[in-house]
């Protein structure tokens, strides 16, 4: 009799994806983040579902419903902070996952890479709308500032913003629709992640050497299931530490003040994981220019495969590119820091220089380093 694992129409799909999947034997811990992202997504959907049972998306009661969750619901504070800090963990894993893809040349799988970019946009949209829901000061003003950026679009901008708001300012209609979108988007992300995985399994995983590993594969289970469990334990440890010891470490104190349209906070800023893009937006004195730079800071990932000039796939044996990669990481950390600072000297100048460096490294220096490395190897 055939093993049910290999014959059952549904179970065999799981088997081909997570059990008998042929995997390169040399993939490092950097390949853990894909499964960690899947776990983060499931965690967010579950905690979000329980939060939605107690939350009300009305401007009059949203803030108090979140307070009620934290004070009166059994373990409501755990669920709320798991959800809020789970988003931070999600983005940490996302940035590591994208960084790994850039370092080891995983962008050479164009379908998988492009679905990944769509996933990034969907997750960013979900996180932004989720930040609006507690209806604190930073929720309200963050929503006002970020949606207002669309007014920079010529001719239709103002109408578009008012259409998104459902009125002439961020109001009850805005909060209700943001809640609806925040609820539905994770399921769209789930579908996209499945397609992402489907395309990946068409080609098989990349590996640190960047060379094909068709001649040498191992089954995913038990080798990588065990390896992924270690990553999961570390993720749970980090998240639990954050939730139980300093749940508000990554949040903004202004969000504990109920939303007030008549009082603007001194420094409006998004959550930490958007600060790098926010710094790029602010570094350009023109509104439309800033919005374009903001979009390009993420969309630039789509042209990374076109800028690959090296004859080697990954950066494992390319020291010049390695230096540039880590320079890019340092630059992104600088931008993240600048995004949280007030708009004054010297932060404006540092932000502008860091923004120029960001685009220069990706668009000019990395392709040039690939050509230089080919020349040095006489290829």
Curated annotation (Swiss-Prot):
Its main location: mitochondrion. The chain crosses the membrane at residues 33-53, 77-98, 113-133, 178-198, 226-246, 288-308, 320-340, 347-367. Its cofactor is heme b. It holds the Pfam family Cytochrome_B. The keyword Plastid does not apply. GO terms for molecular function: metal ion binding; ubiquinol-cytochrome-c reductase activity. GO terms for cellular component: mitochondrial inner membrane; respiratory chain complex III. Heme b b562 binds at residues 83, 182. SUPFAM superfamilies: a domain/subunit of cytochrome bc1 complex (Ubiquinol-cytochrome c reductase), Transmembrane di-heme cytochromes. It is found in: Mitochondrion inner membrane. A ubiquinone binds at residue 201. Heme b b566 binds at residues 97, 196. InterPro entries: Cyt_b/b6_C (IPR005798), Cyt_b/b6_C_sf (IPR036150), Cyt_b/b6_N (IPR005797), Cytb/b6-like_sf (IPR027387), Cytochrome_b (IPR030689), Cytochrome_b_C_euk/bac (IPR048260), Cytochrome_b_N_euk/bac (IPR048259), Di-haem_cyt_TM (IPR016174). It comes from the Eukaryota. GO terms for biological process: mitochondrial electron transport, ubiquinol to cytochrome c. PROSITE patterns: CYTB_CTER, CYTB_NTER. Keywords: Electron transport, Heme, Iron, Membrane, Metal-binding, Mitochondrion, Mitochondrion inner membrane, Respiratory chain, Transmembrane, Transmembrane helix, Transport, Ubiquinone. It is a multi-pass membrane protein. The keyword tRNA processing does not apply. Belongs to the cytochrome b family. The cytochrome bc1 complex contains 11 subunits: 3 respiratory subunits (MT-CYB, CYC1 and UQCRFS1), 2 core proteins (UQCRC1 and UQCRC2) and 6 low-molecular weight proteins (UQCRH/QCR6, UQCRB/QCR7, UQCRQ/QCR8, UQCR10/QCR9, UQCR11/QCR10 and a cleavage product of UQCRFS1). This cytochrome bc1 complex then forms a dimer. Component of the ubiquinol-cytochrome c reductase complex (complex III or cytochrome b-c1 complex) that is part of the mitochondrial respiratory chain. The b-c1 complex mediates electron transfer from ubiquinol to cytochrome c. Contributes to the generation of a proton gradient across the mitochondrial membrane that is then used for ATP synthesis. Heme 1 (or BL or b562) is low-potential and absorbs at about 562 nm, and heme 2 (or BH or b566) is high-potential and absorbs at about 566 nm. PANTHER family: CYTOCHROME B. This is Cytochrome b. The gene is MT-CYB.
């Amino acid at each position: 009799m055939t093993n049910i694992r290999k014959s059952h129409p549904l179970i065999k799909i799981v088997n081909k994806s997570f059990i008998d999947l042929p995997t390169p034997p040399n993939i490092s811990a950097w390949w853990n983040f894909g499964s960690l992202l899947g776990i983060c997504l499931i965690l967010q959907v579950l905690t979000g579902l329980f939060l939605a049972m107690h939350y009300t998306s009305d401007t009059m009661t949203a803030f108090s419903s979140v307070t009620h969750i934290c004070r009166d619901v059994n373990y409501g504070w755990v669920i709320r902070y798991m959800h809020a800090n789970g988003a931070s963990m999600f983005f940490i894993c996302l940035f590591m996952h994208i960084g790994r893809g850039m370092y080891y040349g995983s962008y050479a799988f164009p379908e998988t890479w492009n679905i990944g970019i769509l996933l990034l946009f969907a997750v960013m949209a979900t996180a932004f709308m989720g930040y609006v829901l507690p209806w604190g000061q930073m929720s309200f003003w963050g929503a006002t500032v970020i949606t207002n950026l669309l007014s920079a679009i010529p001719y239709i901008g103002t109408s578009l913003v008012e259409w998104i708001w459902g009125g002439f300012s961020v109001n009850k209609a805005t909060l209700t629709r943001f809640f609806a979108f925040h609820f539905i988007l994770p399921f769209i992300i789930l579908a996209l992640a499945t397609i992402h995985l489907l395309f990946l399994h068409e080609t098989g995983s990349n590996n640190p050497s960047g060379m094909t590993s068709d001649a040498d594969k191992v089954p995913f289970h038990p080798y990588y299931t065990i390896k992924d469990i270690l990553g999961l334990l570390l993720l749970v440890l980090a998240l639990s530490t954050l939730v139980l010891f300093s749940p508000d470490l990554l949040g903004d104190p202004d969000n504990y003040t109920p939303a007030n349209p008549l009082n603007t906070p001194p420094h409006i800023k998004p959550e930490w994981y958007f600060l790098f893009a926010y710094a790029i937006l602010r570094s350009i004195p023109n509104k439309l220019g800033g919005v374009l730079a903001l979009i390009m800071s993420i969309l630039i990932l789509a042209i990374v495969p076109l800028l690959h000039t090296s004859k080697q796939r990954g950066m494992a044996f390319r020291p010049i590119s390695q230096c540039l990669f880590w320079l890019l990481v340092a630059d992104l950390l600088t931008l993240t820091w600048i995004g949280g600072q007030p708009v004054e000297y010297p932060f404006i100048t540092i932000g502008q220089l860091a923004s120029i460096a960001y685009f220069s490294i990706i668009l000019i220096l990395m392709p040039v380093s690939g050509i230089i490395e080919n020349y040095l190897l006489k290829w």
